[in-house]
Structure formats: C-alpha cells, structure tokens
Amino acid sequence: STASATADAEGSANMYTEFAAVVVDKDGKILADLIDTIQPKIGFDAKGEITTVTFNGTKKELRNDYNMVTYGGAIAEWFEQATTFENYIVGKTADEVNAIATVTNAEGYQVATEADADLVAGCTMAINGYQESVTKAIANAK
C-alpha cells in the first residue's frame, strides 16, 4: 500500500521483493533451492526525502509472526507453504518450473492449479513470482 505525503503527514510505500537461490546439476535440474520475500516499508516527506525504513525480517524469518493463517485464512503459514514449493521443484528444470500451471484466485493472485495436486495440498499462495525468481537463479547458476 502507498500513501502520498502532505505538509502534515509522512507518505509511505511498501516494497515487495521475491528472491530465490538454487543449486543445479549439470543438466540444470534443481538439487536444492530456497525462496523468500522482503517487504520493507518506506516513509518519506513532502519533498520526497526518505524519513524512515522499517524492515522486520524476511517472511521466512518472521515464521508464524507473518500471520498468513490468522489474517489471510491460508491453509498454512507462509514459511510452510514456501517449503512445500521448494520441495516440489527439486528435480525440475527451469522449463518444468515455468510449466507449473497457475490460475488467478479470488484475491487476484496466481496460484497453482489442481493439476498439481501435490503442490496445491500444501501451497495455495501466489507462486508466479517465485517461478520467475527460480528461473533467473537457474540461469545465473550455469
């Protein structure tokens, strides 16, 4: 979310960065991987000068304090869903990770389809950004 700064009130902007790291074999298949996200909040004044930066840790570091189940009605906390995704893509290539079909859910997020039942059983969060991050990490690992 964002808010414009005024003469009386600080403005704010949220930054959202997804990232991935992978270990791949000679054929580009994932041997190990991790995904995570940072969401710092930035405050700024009417001149556009940054006045505050708040960062409470990555989603994995926050663990249960991210409160995806409590406030989002999710099937599992973010770090648990991330682990499901990480485990699911082990042994896959970039093309196979990108081939995981997604559909837009009611909240507007790209989530895995029922075609990937093993993934959907433990991961109902948006995955399209992580598919992209993993693909870039694989390209960088070669």
Predicted regions and their residues:
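Active-site- and interface-proximal helix/loop "cap" or "latch" segments in soluble metabolic
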Residues: S1-K142
